[in-house]
Amino acid sequence: MRFVPALLAALFLCCGAQAATAPKIGITSLSEIEVPDAPFAVGANADADVDAAFARARKDGKRVLIDMGGNWCADCRILSGLMERPELHAFLAKHYELVTVDVGRFDKNLDIPARFGITTRLEGVPAIIVATPAGQIVNPGRVSAIEDARHMTPQALADWLAQWTP
């Protein structure tokens, strides 16, 4: 009987907390999304933007979601449009400090993924890095998992983004 509390503690530590459930997305097709023309600020100072996101994350106890892509990329623009939908935007703002980084045609701001040990060419975009406020990557090996965003449902994309919440 004295082992029950220890067993419960061990189960909690090994299983961890569950991620937050993604909001229900009010559309079923990505064709219903208003797709922005240029969601990535081409001349932005990505290093400063990412540093500021981490400063806010440390203050607010949130994770950082770094959305890397380019304005030429249809999947990147579709994902950006989905993330602006009110139901998903509110969810993301509650759980993450969101920052967008223009990687051009895989030739700009590559020092950002390098901060997290990604020193080879990105597999595709959009590429999403989720990190703790201390800078520890949470989704290693899954950074380019939604590079084919246009072939996913809006709900599947929201669920993918939600799985990395604390």
Predicted regions and their residues:
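Short pre-active-site segment immediately N-terminal to redox-active cysteine/selenocysteine motifs
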Residues: 61-64, 69-72
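Typically the conserved alpha-helix immediately C-terminal to a functionally engaged Cys/Sec
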Residues: 76-91
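N-terminal leader/targeting and pre-domain segments
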Residues: 21-60
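The canonical Cys-X-X-Cys-His
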Residues: 73-77, 128
